[in-house]
A protein has these predicted regions:
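Bacterial Sec-dependent N-terminal signal peptides
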Residues: 1-5, 14-39, 238-240
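N-terminal targeting leaders for non-cytosolic proteins
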Residues: 26-126, 132
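Buried hydrophobic residues that stabilize the cores of well-folded domains
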Residues: 34-41, 168-177
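Extended extracellular/luminal ectodomain segments enriched in beta-structured repeat modules
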Residues: 132-139, 206
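Generic short beta-strand segments
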Residues: 142-148, 212-217
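Short coil-to-beta strand junction motifs in C2/discoidin
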Residues: 151-171
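Terminal, low-complexity interaction segments
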Residues: 170-240
């Protein structure tokens, strides 16, 4: 009887594990790794040929596996490249927060997440599925850029350090279905300093996600802090 009982438990555990594995079989992860992605990294970070020169008119990317795509927003007509906003590919890492808290180092993150490449969002930007399909994006890893984190931590003479109660810098992720999610990069003196995985499954099936940033320190032109962040390891539910 005991042998039968333990066998039953083992079988149940086996079925449970199999179920979990099968559920993960339809997950594709966008990591931005490979030569085709590295070719999209501009040098120098600001004023380079891909994001500001001849390449700015055609700069964009589409992941072959997930169909997720991004690029420059061309919000003002496209003449100013990445300065108008967008999603650029990067591999720059530097933790020199005070020296590199400037737009000339706009594609850097302060710490590696173990991979080579990642994406950097500036200003209001959108990623979408190129095929126009609806898919669930389960999660992604996000991180402040070195520029953003440096200004949040030390200020820069224009924007204040976000080290006090009431200070905040928040990312809002808006799905095309109308659902939204807020993620704090700074809140009441607590500042995100490294990579963080965020669960996006509550947004449901989406065609696109739009990223916007806002904060407590503002002028008549809007938030004073640099609106940059990085993301990586985007988990997407694919069709079974």
């Amino acid at each position: 009887m005991k042998k039968f009982f333990y066998l039953a438990i083992a079988l149940c555990m086996g079925f449970a594990l199999t179920s979990c594995n099968n559920d993960d079989d339809n997950i594709a992860v966008l990591t931005f790794e490979g030569t085709e992605w590295t070719a999209l990294i501009d040098n120098p970070q600001y004023g380079g040929p891909l994001l500001y020169g001849e390449g700015k008119d055609t700069y964009g990317w589409t992941d072959a596996r997930t169909g997720l795509s991004g690029g420059l927003t061309r919000a003002w007509g496209g003449n100013y490249g990445y300065s108008e906003g967008g999603v650029a590919i990067s591999n720059y890492v530097c933790d020199s927060l005070q020296k590199h808290a400037t737009y000339t180092y706009q594609l850097e993150v302060p710490v590696s997440n173990g991979s080579k490449n990642f994406a950097v969002v500036y200003c209001d930007a959108t990623i979408k599925f190129a095929e126009g399909v609806n898919r669930v994006i389960r999660s992604m890893d996000i991180c402040p850029t070195t520029y953003l984190l440096g200004v949040e931590t030390y200020g820069d003479g224009y924007a204040k350090a976000l080290t006090e109660a009431g200070d905040n810098m928040t990312l809002t992720i808006t799905a095309d279905n109308g659902k939204t999610m807020d993620v704090d990069f700074a809140r009441d003196g607590n500042i995100l300093k490294t990579w963080k995985r965020i669960d996006l499954s509550a947004l449901g099936a989406v065609k696109s996600l739009t990223f916007t940033m806002d904060g407590s320190d503002k002028s008549e032109y809007g938030v004073k802090h640099p609106k940059y962040f990085a993301f990586d390891n985007v988990k997407v539910e694919m069709e079974k």
